[in-house]
Amino acid sequence: MNRRMKIARIGAARLSAALLLAALPGLPVFAGVQMAHAASTEPDQPADMLVPPTSASDFTAAQLDSVLAGSWRAEANRARDVYRHPKATLQFFGVRPDQTVVEITPGGGWYSEILAPLLHDNGHYIAAVAASSRDGEARRDDSALHRKFAADAAHYGNARIVEFDPKAPVFGAPASADRVLTFRNVHNWVMADTAPAMFKAFFAVLRPGGVLGVVDHRADDAASLDTVKQSGYLPTRYVVKLATEAGFTLDESSEINANPKDTKNYPKGVWTLPPTLTLGEQDRAKYIAIGESDRMTLRFVKPAAQAGETH
């Protein structure tokens, strides 16, 4: 095959891939058209350099890469990617740019910096925060989140913040969300005795077939809830119990956020480790070497509606 024919085939392949993407759910037509135009006008490249995305999952991965590299992300937050594995975690939860995603108690907005821009154009990001009667630290986090969103409309302008009552939570209209995500929060609800109500509210706001994604500090399998809950760690089986009693099915668990260096036995519980480092300079190097906590990563599904059921 001569060089001209090879280039023509490459261009045709790229054009086909771009038009395929244009037909994918959640990808606006103009994006596919722009990609098609680029495919027909870009200068010659070696064939092995051309790796056009050919599926919705490829497109989501490319979008995640772009967002994770975003200049709007705080440097301190970016430094924690090595512990929190945001790309792999969000892919495991099946997050796509065209979905409605509710993040429960986002704190200062570590994941907000990723999710809000990812969902800005074709989806909806909703940050659910507890009503403002809470303690000072929680109020400061929520105020910081409001300021973050207000200061950068280009990335957060379509994000919403909704308040809920932890004792009787409602996160939105029934069956209105594709994903509910929560990161390192369940232990707080267990200590406050609000966890069952929270999981029931997650179930209510999700569409049938929707996913609940949970990440939290993982206790040893043999640990009892009573002995560890004040440490910030939870037995995985207890979190599964909370979810299944609310109506969810455990779809899959992952070791994405595992840390085998975490012994889970510290003077100040999980808060002894980074990023909190409650002990300050005491044994700081030791705890930094351990890294952030060992975490369960659980994907639950709200069962699809059965024939004859209404929602």
Task: Please give the residue ranges for each predicted region.
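Class I SAM-dependent methyltransferase Rossmann-like catalytic core
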Residues: 64-92, 96
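A short glycine-rich, Lys/Arg-flanked "PGG" loop and its adjoining helix->strand segment in the class I
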Residues: 116, 195-208
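A short, conserved alpha-helix within the catalytic core of class I
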Residues: 166, 188-201
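Helix-to-beta-strand junctions that scaffold the AdoMet/dcAdoMet cofactor pocket
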Residues: 119-120, 189-191, 206-207
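Conserved beta-strand signature within the Rossmann-like core of class I S-adenosyl-L-methionine
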Residues: 209-217
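Core SAM-dependent methyltransferase catalytic element
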Residues: 263-311
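Conserved class I S-adenosyl-L-methionine
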Residues: 98-107
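A short acidic, Gly/Pro-enriched loop at the edge of an enzyme's catalytic core
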Residues: 170-180
